[in-house]
A protein has these predicted regions:
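Pseudouridine synthases involved in rRNA/tRNA modification
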Residues: 46, 56-131
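SH3/SH3-like beta-barrel fold
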Residues: 41-43
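Short loop/turn positions at the edges of beta-strands in beta-sheet-rich folds
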Residues: 35, 45-47
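Glycine- and acidic-residue-rich catalytic/RNA-contacting loop of pseudouridine synthases
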Residues: 1-39, 95-101, 112, 120-121
């Protein structure tokens, strides 16, 4: 897909077609679990553009819960999400060329111990699987 940034609106737009000002985006995702219309995803950015995950997921019909800009505000309100259900739980450094003063990070991975919305997701998932 392609992403075009609108600076004045502080928003990006996704399209299947390239334009003069667009940049290609690549986003890889894996569904970890799902419940009704909600999914817990592991998302990997293959390109790193402004708002890429948020806008790309909304473009394919799966906006982030709690995202007031690209998501569904009625849904956010219904579930009480004031913040995006988006978390960088893992950061992996794989430099393909010399990274200078950051080279000591090459090959290292850092993982967050807990993601704030996962317990809430699984509470809803258990009620989902019992119905």
């Amino acid at each position: 897909a392609y992403l075009e940034k609108n600076e004045s609106q502080n928003r990006v737009y996704i399209s299947s077609k390239s334009t003069k000002n667009s940049k290609i985006i690549k986003t890889k995702y894996t569904v970890i679990d799902e419940c009704r219309h909600f999914s817990l995803l592991d998302v990997e950015l293959l390109t790193g553009r402004t708002h890429q995950i948020r806008a790309h997921m909304a473009y394919v019909g799966h906006p982030l819960l709690g995202d007031g800009k690209y998501g569904k505000n009625a849904q956010n309100k219904r579930f009480g999400y004031k913040y995006q259900a988006l978390y960088s739980y893992k950061l992996k450094f794989c430099f393909e060329s010399p990274a200078g003063s950051l080279n000591y990070l090459n090959g290292k991975t850092f993982v967050a111990p807990k993601v704030w919305f996962v317990d809430d997701f699984y509470k809803n998932l258990s009620s989902c699987k019992n119905t």
